[in-house]
Amino acid sequence: MPSHQHQNQQQCTPQAQQQQVKQPCQPPPTKCQEACVPKTKDPCVPQAKKQCPARSTTNPAQEKCPAQQDPKCKQK
């Protein structure tokens, strides 16, 4: 009889923990990654959304000048 109770508890622990960790862990990272947070420490922050598009436009615009497009821009 005691062996029967042990088998019932083992099958209920792994299945209940796996379903509870997979449900709340998959939606947040998947929804946050689609917003635009590849180089941010916080995958779910209101500031991360603003830094993604703002940094993306300032990075290529500022790097385009002294990068290798206009040698006159580097001297100025």
UniProtKB/Swiss-Prot annotation:
The reply to whether Nuclease figures as a keyword in the UniProt entry is no
Q: Describe its PTM? A: Cross-linked to membrane proteins by transglutaminase.
GO biological process per UniProt:
keratinization
Q: What is its main location?
A: cytoplasm
CC terms in the record's Gene Ontology section: cell cortex
Q: Which domain of life is it from?
A: Eukaryota
Positions of the region Disordered?
Answer: 38-76
Entry keywords, A to Z = Cytoplasm, Keratinization
Q: Where in the cell is it found?
A: Cytoplasm; Cytoplasm, Cell cortex
The UniProt similarity line reads: Belongs to the cornifin (SPRR) family.
User: What's the stated role of this polypeptide?
Assistant: Cross-linked envelope protein of keratinocytes. Involved in UV-induced cornification.
Q: What is this protein called?
A: Small proline-rich protein 4
> What is the organism field in this record?
Mus musculus
Q: What is the lineage of its organism?
A: Eukaryota, Metazoa, Chordata, Craniata, Vertebrata
